[in-house]
Amino acid sequence: MRKAIEIKSEVVSEIVEKLQKSSAAVVVDYKGLTVEEVTELRKQMREAGVDYKVYKNTLVRRAAKEVGIEQFNDELLVGTNAIAFGYDDPVAPARILKGFMDSHPKMKLKMGIVEGAFYDESKIVEMANIPSREVLIAKLLGSLKAPVSNFAYLIDAIAKKAEGQEEA
């Protein structure tokens, strides 16, 4: 049987790797959730490409210290915590967690690191309200397309009006 120290060292290395590779890491207090609710949350996370893991707070603090994240300290990392690691979309973990919290008020956002910057709970909630990248691109394209469409309708109306005057 392997020594507990070796196992803990491997877990710390795993957390360090996830913190370095991820564009976002959001810490949440999941106290009071049932197994079914946590399973549902994990499924939503997996579908969005987000890792949702529960680690011992002491191991998270060690890993955060290795990476240089001083905010993951004794004051904030207490209780039943899980971390959602986002890789492609830095806002995805916050968005999914906030959506889940709307129907499961027992869960609480604590803090997060998004693209190297520390955010408290209120900033993470603000970030969660930002639409997804796809929605923002669609809105941008819609606003770019609108003037062209309006111009085309205007030209068409002028052409129809000119045809009406020629017939008279």
UniProtKB/Swiss-Prot annotation:
InterPro entries membership: Ribosomal_uL10 (IPR001790), Ribosomal_uL10-like_sf (IPR043141), Ribosomal_uL10_bac (IPR022973), Ribosomal_uL10_bac_type (IPR047865), Ribosomal_uL10_CS_bac (IPR002363)
GO molecular function: large ribosomal subunit rRNA binding; structural constituent of ribosome
Source domain of life: Bacteria
Record field: transmembrane: none
CDD domains assigned: Ribosomal_L10
Gene Ontology biological process terms, A to Z: translation
Cellular component GO terms, alphabetical: large ribosomal subunit
Keywords for this protein: Ribonucleoprotein, Ribosomal protein, RNA-binding, rRNA-binding
Keyword presence, Flavoprotein: no
The protein's assembly and partners: Part of the ribosomal stalk of the 50S ribosomal subunit. The N-terminus interacts with L11 and the large rRNA to form the base of the stalk. The C-terminus forms an elongated spine to which L12 dimers bind in a sequential fashion forming a multimeric L10(L12)X complex.
Function in brief: Forms part of the ribosomal stalk, playing a central role in the interaction of the ribosome with GTP-bound translation factors.
Family, per entry: Belongs to the universal ribosomal protein uL10 family.
HAMAP family the UniProt entry points to: Ribosomal_uL10 (MF_00362)
Protein's name according to its UniProt entry: Large ribosomal subunit protein uL10
Annotated source species: Clostridioides difficile (strain 630) (Peptoclostridium difficile)
